[in-house]
Amino acid sequence: MSQKLQKPSFLSEYLRSIRLFSKKCVRPSGKELSMSIKRHAIGIGFLGILGYAIKLIHIPINNIIVSSPGKE
């Protein structure tokens, strides 16, 4: 019986600690947030361009390997 009573208190204590932690956290300003979003967008764009370039280079190489001169 006492274990059933402790579960809600554990949960409420856990939620209370989460609330206190989130209040103590320092949130970024609008300028810092926009700078972070821009950096993430540039990084994602760079990875997309890099993936496209690798695919573009490997397609002709794959076609050369697959279509060997001995096969018709």
Curated annotation (Swiss-Prot):
Subcellular location: Endoplasmic reticulum membrane
Record bears the keyword Oxidoreductase: no
Topology of the protein relative to the lipid bilayer: Single-pass membrane protein
One Pfam family, short name: SecE
GO molecular function, one term: protein transmembrane transporter activity
Membrane side Cytoplasmic: residue ranges: 1-40
GO annotation terms (biological process): intracellular protein transport; protein targeting
Keywords: Endoplasmic reticulum, Membrane, Protein transport, Translocation, Transmembrane, Transmembrane helix, Transport
Extracellular topology ranges: 62-72
InterPro entries (alphabetical): Prot_translocase_SecE_dom_sf, Translocase_Sec61-g, Translocase_SecE/Sec61-g
Domain of life: Eukaryota
TM stretches of this protein: 41-61
CC annotations in GO: endoplasmic reticulum membrane
Chief localization: endoplasmic reticulum
Family: Belongs to the SecE/SEC61-gamma family.
Annotated function: Necessary for protein translocation in the endoplasmic reticulum.
UniProt cross-references to NCBIfam families, sorted A to Z: secE_euk_arch
Subunit annotation: Heterotrimeric complex composed of SEC61-alpha, SEC61-beta and SEC61-gamma.
Protein name per Swiss-Prot or TrEMBL: Probable protein transport protein Sec61 subunit gamma
